[in-house]
Amino acid sequence: MAEDGLPKIYSHPPTESSKTPTAATIFFGADNAIPKSETTITSEGDHVTSVNEYVLESDFSTTADNKLTPTKEKLRSEDDMGTDFIKSTTHLQKEITSLTGTANSITRDSITENFMTVKIGNISSPVTTVSLIDFSTDIAKEDILLDTIDTGDAEILITSEVSGTLKDSSAGVADTPAFPRIKDEADMNNYNSSIKSNVPADEAIQVTDSIIPEAEIPPAPEVNFTTIPDITALEEEKMTKIDLSVLEDDTSAVATLTDSDEEKFITVFELTTSAEKDKDNQEDTLLTDEESPEGANMWMERETATEAETHSVLLTAVESRYDFVVPASIATNLVEDSSTEEELSETDRTETVPKITEPFSGTSSVLDTPDYKEDTSTTETDIFELLKEEPDEFMI
């Protein structure tokens, strides 16, 4: 640090003596002069961290540990050790012929050709030597992977042969790839191997791997495929059972549903046709014609359908065919009949109305109350008398 607190600024980089002994500096330029740019190659173990960009021919010098070594002697020493070579061939106007035979004219450019060689074995390299690939020298031929064998355009056939005793439908099949034989190379496919398991002698199975023609390949045991048709048949049966649907054209299915829901259909039928039965039984509905000049009661069919559908009372399916109906119009007529009976007695009119309303005298007092609810049990006898039927014969 300077006295004024600012860092010191050097006009030139430190000297070579301040660098580590494992670093090598390469200078480029004419007559070993220091150029404007320099590149440092640092060797950390066996790996190169940086590589020079420009190398000029006849101007190559290396400084390592403050010692200059001639280029030819350096290349000779590296050639003797079997290391990497860096061959610099550059010229301002030089033609370089490529591998394809095309001549490329390169001007004002420098080209660096790096020739890397592979050294088998562990190399104890010096500072500037880099070991790229290390192979073990004790590699057996059997340890080579089959994927690395170059078979060319030949096809690889996988053949198998099963020999021995097959018992309980169990056998071991070993598949081996048959590679074509390469020139000047031993055929590794012509070998036989037998495998025996820890079983008794009578159940021993021998599996032999060999190359056989495709026509002689034995078929697979049929026992392994006997279950496949059975599974297919079972699946088809399940599909036929599951795929059951009631079609609209199937009359038997509709008839079955009708029989099971007969009670419901009868009840609905009675509900929809109760108005028509009320028309047939005109005695059930008694209406008063207020517009009549004589003021007498008349049998009328006016507004019968709406009243029957609104106030009809339906019982069980069996009893509904007798149509136990108590229309609300009867209740209103009973109240009106009680008042008209007194008026008729004063005016000396016909006595037909009291005769008709006598069977309903028991219900007229009950209907006068405002909280009245229709109860078929209290008026059951009167309704049967109105229908002219005996209740004991039809009750269940």
From Swiss-Prot:
- Give the region (Disordered) as residue ranges: 1-21, 276-296, 336-396
Sites where Phosphothreonine occurs are at T288
Q: Origin, by domain of life?
A: Eukaryota
Q: Which UniProt keywords apply?
A: Calcium, Cell projection, Cilium, Cytoplasm, Cytoplasmic vesicle, Flagellum, Membrane, Mitochondrion, Mitochondrion inner membrane, Phosphoprotein
Q: Where in the cell is it found?
A: Cytoplasm; Mitochondrion inner membrane; Cell projection, Cilium, Flagellum; Cytoplasmic vesicle, Secretory vesicle, Acrosome
Sequence ranges of Acidic residues compositional bias = 283-293
Q: What's a single GO MF annotation on this record?
A: calcium ion binding
Asked whether the UniProt record includes Mitochondrion among its keywords, one would answer yes
- Pfam families per UniProt: CABS1
Task: Tell me which Gene Ontology terms the entry assigns under biological process.
Answer: flagellated sperm motility; spermatogenesis
Determine if Calcium is one of this entry's keywords. Answer: yes
Example of a GO cellular component annotation carried by this entry = motile cilium
Q: Which residues carry this modification: Phosphoserine?
A: S274, S320, S377
Explain the purpose of this protein: Calcium-binding protein. Essential for maintaining the structural integrity of the sperm flagella.
The name this protein carries in UniProt is Calcium-binding and spermatid-specific protein 1
